[in-house]
């Protein structure tokens, strides 16, 4: 909110500099965006009196003006269509600086000397959104009592200082001058002179005879009140009122509309004025809109309403989008003679949603969203009615018509002096604490050291003991709180088991040639459900996504990595090996919030080894990916057996080149080639992926680490080639060899696989090297042969293999 320092001075005897006040507000109440004066960067702008005008001899749109600038009468050439003699105007003298840092010089225009410039508001820094529309095409006229030669700034409110506050969601009371006055008075210990104007009901008619209000659902409008002002004349507002508005960033429109905006700024109470004669019925109500119900708002935009929008109705016809924007059909115009004035409190959540839905974020909707002071609804309505009557020459009808009225909620909270001093580290006494609450306007009851506080309804952000402690701290002064270092022994820091796992995972995979990638956690609904380790329900959806590409939380890391691969491939980087460690979000039907799981995934495409003089190129295949996963899991030192089980059911994966990864009997991930159609959809070549659930790896039992001396005795190896059924897996053979290999078998290595010609149908050949070694002595040939023969016999019995 843009807070006028001069307006504050009307209500508070404050003598601190605006910059110092802004710093105090920032340290005590809310953040500050900016502190500025509307005249910043401008100079040599004075009041001028147009003594006479004559047409330019060589132009049909320029005028020669003789202007009294206080000391001299100078000629100024002006192109504004509304320039006339006898008016006080804004004059930029030679050497003046106007908006956009433009310097004014003496010049000739079509051969005629011009010693300055007559200015419109937009030319001296006013934005197009603030300058009154009546002067869009012309210069601004100053009051008749303005003295030629004087600075124009005081006449336009440009000598004021504006403090632009950035209000947090919990301090909606600060969206008003009243809220700012209350807070500033509290932390400076000042007495407020806030003025409330009383209403004079000088019409003989009763409001209840002119309009009726029936609120069927008070959830939509907990408070709704209305007054009627008759026999008014709609015209331009007085300059003082326009200054209040444009210094707050609001465009003056007319006396009726300007009063509602002025009261909005003063009390934080949004009001809406209807042209009484244009109301289609005199029965006012509030209801939900009908789905796709048409409605034209004040901005002349026809909108299709949603069934969750709130509308104010006359009869059953919508006349306003409640709390957001009025309707064009009942808008105030120059022909308006009677005004129906609304003051209400609407449901803040519904107002926020409909403002977002229709992209109508107004001063009113912002206040309804943050909260409106229920104490001043009627006060604001009365003052607005009186001002409209005074400025429009009308009369206020007798009484207020009330459709609904919410009871004031004033929480009572108890706390003790010892608790206050314990939490804040202070040594306050009861009198000092009570003084702070008195300055805040909070009523107190004292019982020894026990203090019971009644919070006024205007401070709806204060509800519990912690809120009161915060109020004491900020009014006492955060800078005055004692600073005490915690007393504790220092401990040597260490990584948690989770942190160590994540760090180790990164080191291992980077050592295996993969580069780390970080992808968006949000993606499309389709991609969010792809490549799940275990199938789950639908992904978590965002209510208000940034874009259609970021609507759901990922349930796998792989889709993000494939997007990264596609990005690289599109830029001619075809050899891509990436990994990502991050969280996925798994939804469960019986839980409101998704479960966050730490996962690890990798993706490989292109060549692992490039073609050069001493080695041929090697394209990534399933076994490269499997080797990386095996090496990684070996480094994790898991006690349970790691197994790879073929899976033909994963729809995003190649049915013949995919395996699930198990830790013991628990599914921990999967590995394989992505389905060719999926690769085509992502516009990438043949690609292999894997994903592991790190939560399971973290929870799994680990082997105890111990170090073993390297044997100084020689090793002996034996090779064996087996002819076996093609359905028998390498894992089965390795398990059998290790089972019967004996205590001295230290390594088994598969060095050849052959399938094809010269072999019987449905057969394949696997060749292994078995290495034997003893750390205590040299093995004999007989010892090795005995162990090797046991392996051969066992393989022959179990798998019906033929030794080649």
What is the predicted role of each segment?
Residues 2, 27, 439-442, 595, ...:
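A carboxyl-terminal module marker
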Residues 1-198, 373-374, 380:
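Phosphate-backbone binding interfaces of nucleic-acid-interacting proteins
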Residues 47-77, 254, 260-329:
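Conserved mixed alpha/beta core segments that line enzyme active sites in large multi-domain catalysts
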Residues 63, 193-294, 608:
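Glycine/proline-enriched, intrinsically flexible loops and inter-domain linkers
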Residues 113-125, 134-135, 139, 312-408, ...:
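Mobile "lid/hinge" segments at catalytic clefts and subdomain interfaces of large enzymes
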Residues 188-214, 394-419:
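Terminal amphipathic helices with adjacent charged low-complexity linkers/tails
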Residues 413, 417, 421-574, 771-773, ...:
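Extended, well-folded interaction surfaces typified by the phenylalanyl-tRNA synthetase beta subunit core
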Residues 39-43, 201, 490, 495, ...:
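Beta-rich nucleic-acid/ligand-interaction surfaces
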